[in-house]
Amino acid sequence: ASKTCPSNTPLSCHNTTVVQDTCCFIPSGQLLQTQFWDTDPSTGPSDSWTIHGLWPDNCDGSFPQTCDASRAYTNITDILTAMGADDTLQYMQTYWKDYQGNDESFWEHEWGKHGTCITTLDPGCYDDYVPTEEAADFFSKTVSLFKTLPTYQWLADAGITPDGSKSYALDDIQSALSQQHGAEVTLGCDGKTLNEVWYHFNVKGSLQDGQFVAAEPDGAKSTCPDDVYYDPKK
């Protein structure tokens, strides 16, 4: 299990001095839960966005990547099964999809590039460490966070549903999602078509057990034009 963290740990990106205990504090503490809306080819259910990943940015918007090649695991399905994370795996098989159909290599990429850069997942941050358990924690946390961010439902509640024949004001989409999230979000487009959203968080404590707090984006809020298309999945 991961080590217990003190309750007075500062919120990431809000510390005034360097925090030495990186098992209970993430220096790259702007965490982004990123989601796809894939329509061509489509992935996942027609009434849900899908998981892209969980990314640690530095507080200035830059980001580390591929931080430990020795832990770039290549058997995520086996790891999750061995660690008893069957529910997480089953959920990922529906909601964490690769548009080219190779989910396993997509998961390996997300773990190796981003997961290995989250300091609280370092093997030294565990009591009685079992090899690969930190990867299971990464995927389980990403899934549980994604479940709290139902983009499709939040947009539908604001009257914004996929429609191939009309466009929506980007401001209306931003407003609907930021009101629910508690901070602005980052919206991504392919041309004029909405296809990605990033929810930003800071964390008090570890990734495994800490508190995620909505945070303002650490960069541009959008790559989209003022009016966008939100296409139905094919």
Curated annotation (Swiss-Prot):
The active site is at residues 52, 110, 114. Glycans are attached at residues 15, 75. The keyword Lyase applies. GO terms for cellular component: extracellular region. Its EC number is 4.6.1.19. It is an enzyme of class 4 (lyase). InterPro entries: Ribonuclease_T2_eukaryotic (IPR033697), RNase_T2-like (IPR001568), RNase_T2-like_sf (IPR036430), RNase_T2_His_AS_1 (IPR018188), RNase_T2_His_AS_2 (IPR033130). Keywords: Disulfide bond, Endonuclease, Glycoprotein, Hydrolase, Lyase, Nuclease. GO terms for molecular function: ribonuclease T2 activity; RNA binding. GO terms for biological process: RNA catabolic process. Disulfide bonds join 5-24, 13-59, 23-125, 67-117, 189-224. Gene3D superfamilies: Ribonuclease T2-like. It catalyses: a ribonucleotidyl-ribonucleotide-RNA + H2O = a 3'-end 3'-phospho-ribonucleotide-RNA + a 5'-end dephospho-ribonucleoside-RNA + H(+). Belongs to the RNase T2 family. This is a base non-specific and adenylic acid preferential ribonuclease. This is Ribonuclease Trv. It comes from Hypocrea rufa.
